[in-house]
């Protein structure tokens, strides 16, 4: 999914990814005006190279890059000792579009001995390792701060700190969970939330005392073995509209508003993002939503966080606004859509970012999808047009490529149907037109014998 960060890149920026972006997709995006340099760690299509071990392949990208950088530094020192003119920064393979082939290395040369900006999707435990190995970089918030503000416990307490209604109840043991749950069940079902669950994962709907007793019993056994419980319990609210607001907190505490995105959720899970219309913005202004966000952003800055932040919010069926459902102290899918829209909005268009979960037939290649979209007239080929923009290749192909390589190497016997996920920007005149485009995309995939599961 690291490929999805290309909308944040300028022509001289480098997008680091785990696997090589499909060259046809890379050239297609460059033709649309998304010009960037690409470096990658693995080229899975190169059958001359051994497949990486699973534990190596799944390592955090920061760890992979840090190890590569450290190995490169060691190699440079050895070569310099014997007078070699070994070039810098050759640790990761690179793709350069024709536009950069002649002189695209200037900016990196300038950055070699200065502080470089680093913009990760999220800060992880391995970020500090990479900063030390490959820096200097512009400052990032420390991991402890990021973990704390990402917790649903933090966001629940934040609501109290700024004087807003708190819907959640904290529970730090099985007994506390059962006690708080009994109170909530008098009003109806409730959600038992993992403080660090992402995109609805980690939420469990409790609809009765019998189910609650089973969960509490399981937690009690874990606690007696030495583990600790922590959950947030929230009533199952009658939601009307899910949306998110996106901001950037500067290191000095100044706040920049980026966008409000309406979320197309499927039950508790993320299903897509589209820019909020003027009617929703006016409703939020009238409800004091943006004043509440200013207070929340101020607290985040006071607590040491800076960088991109997303507030998941909702409007209930009765019209009440719940300003903070959770905080995502990182980039987000809605933010990616907001940056894509910076391109489409110059032509008066709006993008819907969504995805399709796929099952791939034998012999499928990403280039076949691009060709089929082009032949059908669905592929958006000019910024001022309408159509489908595929955003990533490896989310679609990585499992298929790994499966094929393992079968070839005798490590696997049955292919099954490898799964993938196709992220797309659907650029249309209005909601009806965008729905028509996504339905046509489904038909193109069906014609390619690709199964769509959602």
Task: For every predicted segment, state its role.
Residues 4, 17-179, 183:
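Conserved N-proximal alpha/beta basic substrate-recognition cap immediately N-terminal to
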Residues 269-318, 359, 364-385:
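A long amphipathic alpha-helix within ATP-dependent nucleotide-binding catalytic cores
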Residues 2-10:
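Histidine-anchored nucleotide/phosphate-binding helix
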Residues 214-265, 315-323:
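Phosphate-binding site of ATP-dependent enzymes
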Residues 346-454:
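Peripheral (often C-terminal) accessory segments that flank ATP-dependent C-N-forming ligase machineries
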Residues 240, 247-297, 304, 328-355:
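ATP-dependent carboxylate/phosphate-activation module, predominantly the ATP-grasp catalytic core
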Residues 168, 190-215, 243-244, 267-280:
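Glycine-rich phosphate-binding loop of ATP-grasp-fold ATP-dependent ligases
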Residues 159, 184-205, 223-239, 311, ...:
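ATP-grasp fold ATP-binding core
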């Amino acid at each position: 999914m690291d490929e999805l960060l290309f909308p944040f890149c300028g022509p001289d920026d480098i997008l680091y990814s785990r696997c090589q972006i499909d060259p046809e997709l890379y050239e297609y995006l460059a033709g649309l005006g998304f010009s960037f340099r690409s470096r990658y760690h693995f080229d899975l299509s190169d059958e001359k190279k051994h497949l990486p071990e699973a534990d190596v392949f799944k390592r955090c990208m920061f760890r992979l890059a840090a190890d590569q950088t450290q190995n490169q530094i060691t190699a440079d020192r050895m070569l310099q000792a014997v007078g070699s003119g070994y070039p810098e920064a050759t640790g990761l393979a690179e793709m350069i579009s024709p536009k950069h082939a002649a002189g695209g290395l200037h900016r990196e040369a300038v950055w070699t001995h200065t502080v470089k900006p680093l913009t990760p999707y999220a800060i992880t435990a391995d970020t500090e390792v990479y900063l030390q190995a490959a820096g200097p970089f512009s400052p990032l918030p420390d991991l402890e701060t990021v973990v704390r503000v990402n917790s649903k416990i933090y966001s629940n307490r934040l609501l109290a700190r700024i004087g807003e209604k708190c819907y959640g109840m904290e529970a730090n043991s099985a007994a506390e969970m059962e006690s708080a749950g009994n109170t909530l069940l008098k009003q109806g079902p409730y959600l038992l939330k993992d403080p660090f669950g992402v995109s609805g994962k980690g939420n469990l709907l409790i609809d009765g005392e019998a189910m609650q007793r089973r969960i509490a019993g399981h937690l009690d056994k874990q606690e007696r073995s030495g583990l600790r419980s922590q959950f947030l319990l929230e009533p199952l609210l009658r939601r009307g509209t899910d949306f998110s607001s996106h901001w950037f907190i500067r290191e000095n505490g100044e706040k920049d508003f980026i966008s409000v995105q309406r979320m197309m959720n499927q039950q508790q899970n993320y299903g897509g993002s589209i820019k909020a219309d003027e009617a929703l913005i006016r409703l939020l202004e009238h409800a004091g939503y943006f004043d509440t966000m200013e207070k929340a952003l101020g607290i985040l800055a006071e607590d040491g966080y800076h960088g991109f932040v997303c507030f998941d919010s909702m409007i209930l069926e009765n019209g009440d606004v719940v300003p903070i459902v959770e905080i995502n102290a990182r980039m987000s899918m809605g933010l990616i859509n907001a940056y894509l829209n910076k391109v489409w909005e110059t032509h008066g268009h709006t993008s819907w970012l969504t995805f399709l979960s796929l099952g791939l037939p034998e012999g499928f290649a990403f280039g076949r999808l691009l060709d089929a979209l082009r032949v059908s007239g669905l592929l958006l080929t000019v910024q001022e047009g309408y159509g489908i923009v595929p955003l990533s290749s490896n989310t679609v192909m990585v499992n298929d490529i790994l499966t094929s390589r393992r079968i070839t190497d005798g490590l696997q016997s049955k292919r099954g149907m490898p799964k993938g996920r196709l992220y797309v920007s659907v650029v249309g005149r209005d909601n009806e037109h965008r729905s028509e485009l996504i339905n046509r995309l489904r038909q193109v995939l069906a014609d390619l014998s690709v199964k769509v599961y959602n």
